[in-house]
Amino acid sequence: MAEEQDLSEVELSPVGSEEPRCLSPGSAPSLGPDGGGGGSGLRASPGPGELGKVKKEQQDGEADDDKFPVCIREAVSQVLSGYDWTLVPMPVRVNGASKSKPHVKRPMNAFMVWAQAARRKLADQYPHLHNAELSKTLGKLWRLLNESDKRPFIEEAERLRMQHKKDHPDYKYQPRRRKNGKAAQGEAECPGGEAEQGGAAAIQAHYKSAHLDHRHPEEGSPMSDGNPEHPSGQSHGPPTPPTTPKTELQSGKADPKRDGRSLGEGGKPHIDFGNVDIGEISHEVMSNMETFDVTELDQYLPPNGHPGHVGSYSAAGYGLGSALAVASGHSAWISKPPGVALPTVSPPGVDAKAQVKTETTGPQGPPHYTDQPSTSQIAYTSLSLPHYGSAFPSISRPQFDYSDHQPSGPYYGHAGQASGLYSAFSYMGPSQRPLYTAISDPSPSGPQSHSPTHWEQPVYTTLSRP
């Protein structure tokens, strides 16, 4: 009993009364079999704000008395009796501005009052429970409680808050900065895991839109291999930044200017246009392209002044390729594939009949096709306008005949239309700009019934950069 007397003196000392939390782990086993005297000595000085904890500690002390044999309790008491509690260092904030002051914790809210009390009880009853599973269960139980069940915890939390305000009148909450601050805050507000569901939903939506972009890379739109902005079947919206992985053909080489511009116009990245009616906003989005400057488009043309003089290749073919690239907003050059007959240069007197096939979409109903005769040497060019109603203007021959044999006069010589490539492509209104164009197989065939998602004929050429 002398050891217990010494310990009770330590507990009743001023240092012991200032540090009730430090004593609580060791004081519970140090009580004798009667257990009452030591407990009353320890709890002679707590304020009214700790009455709820006092009752809980009494129950824990009684449970611990049954858990440990008498010899263990006496050994613990002997060790603790000679310990000077003034040597215990005070906790300090490592990254705080005032390192001399101890860190003051926030007052517990109602859920924390419930969770702390229930966690101690459940941890004693079910020691095999993992702490994370225990937290999930406590959160679920708290959400199932009605207002009458929550009332005692709410009242206790309010009382703790008022007591905390008295004890620390100049207290100011200063949260520690974390890298993932929003995620931690969401998990604190939703203790049961609602934050995880929200994060999973956002990730799932992002990968859904990314999946739509490369679902049919081989049978999609003609530019889908080199331009992931137009997913097959879902090409009903303005161009959005590429979201496909960088393992695809050229999605990693997308033009940063186009990405920045489309982000600036759209304002929201990665919108899934599969379920959006684009009829109302397409004109508004395309009207923003009126601010393009001619000098900005000049940088995509070859430096020697003419669109066409590239080696011994057909000049008209490269003139057409660069013009189509400028019109569709892509900086990729269209190389000459081995199996495609690009238009050949002939004297001005020889005119071969060719057709420009234009696909137009009415306001409602399936797309229909009109064949416009033109005195051009372009073999068979499919100019597809999937969204915008007016037909593509017929392209006449002198705009594409550039070679070493011919003077550059036809660049300005055509009287029926405005002069030059810019008149045919860059100055069209918002309802006439094509989103993508492609060079098709030269073998002429009759009008086929195309389904929007599967382009079987004509066979499109693959586009690559030299």
Curated annotation (Swiss-Prot):
Q: State where the protein is found.
A: Cytoplasm; Nucleus; Mitochondrion outer membrane
- For this protein, the DNA-binding region equals 104-172
- Give the chief site where it resides: cytoplasm
Q: Which SUPFAM superfamilies match?
A: HMG-box (SSF47095)
GO cellular component terms attached to this protein's record: chromatin; cytoplasm; mitochondrial outer membrane; nucleoplasm; nucleus
Q: Could you list the residue ranges that cross the membrane?
A: none
Region of interest (Transactivation domain (TAC)), residue spans: 353-466
What do we know about how this protein assembles, alone or with others? Monomer. Interacts with Armcx3 at the mitochondrial outer membrane surface. Interacts with PAX3.
- Summary of the function given for this chain in its UniProt record: Transcription factor that plays a central role in developing and mature glia. Specifically activates expression of myelin genes, during oligodendrocyte (OL) maturation, such as DUSP15 and MYRF, thereby playing a central role in oligodendrocyte maturation and CNS myelination. Once induced, MYRF cooperates with SOX10 to implement the myelination program. Transcriptional activator of MITF, acting synergistically with PAX3. Transcriptional activator of MBP, via binding to the gene promoter.
| Domains as described in the record | The transactivation domains TAM and TAC (for transactivation domain in the middle and at the C-terminus, respectively) are required to contact transcriptional coactivators and basal transcriptional machinery components and thereby induce gene transactivation.
What protein name does the entry list?
Transcription factor SOX-10
